[in-house]
Amino acid sequence: MTSPKQASDDIRFMGRAIALAKARMGQTWPNPAVGCVVVREGEVVAEAATAPGGRPHAEEQAVPAAGDRARGAVAYVTMEPCGARSSGRTSCSHFLIDAGVARVVVAAVDPSPFASGRGVERLKKAGLEVETGLLAQEAAVLYEGYLHRVETGRPMVRISDDGEGFDARFAA
């Protein structure tokens, strides 16, 4: 059972990971902007967000930055760590396992072919404690466009119905 302090810390650190991801929104295409915060004994030892252009991934930066302090730590990740990579490089789930992270808290499961539950499954099989869905509503808003594109194959387009912001003319 999670203690009230642990639950409060989880929310705080996931909130930080979401803030890191938000700061990179629109810069990481074709990948989603992901935030990762590595915490050991209540102290942030490393944090990162997906780099512009989509590489390297957040975990791929944060885990090496944490170094030996990643062993036994908790990683707060806004989206499920990838379970495979199109480039053949090490997956983010492997980075977390190899570093000795003890627990991974994930806001949103990634429906893409490179994750789709495989990242979480790989972490669990390796003996890591994994929790999903923390701040899921905030993550759903953050990843609305990405999730739409993965699920439909089309970009999400919103047209404002704000008459003041729309400045176009249509002819018959």
Each PLM stretch: what is its role?
Residues E144-R149, M156-A172:
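Active-site ligand-binding patch in enzyme domains
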Residues A19-G26, D68, L128, E144, ...:
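Generic secondary-structure signature for well-ordered alpha-helical cores
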Residues I18, P32, E43, S112-P113, ...:
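Flexible, active-site-adjacent loop/turn segments at secondary-structure boundaries
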Residues V38-A140:
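Zn2+-dependent cytidine deaminase-like catalytic core
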Residues Q6-W29:
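Short, basic/aromatic recognition patches
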Residues M1-Q6, F170-A171:
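Catalytic cores of nucleic-acid editing and processing enzymes
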Residues T28-G42:
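N-terminal glycine-rich anion-binding loops that anchor highly charged ligand groups
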Residues P30-V34, P56, G153-P155:
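Short, basic and Ser/Thr-rich N-terminal targeting/leader segments
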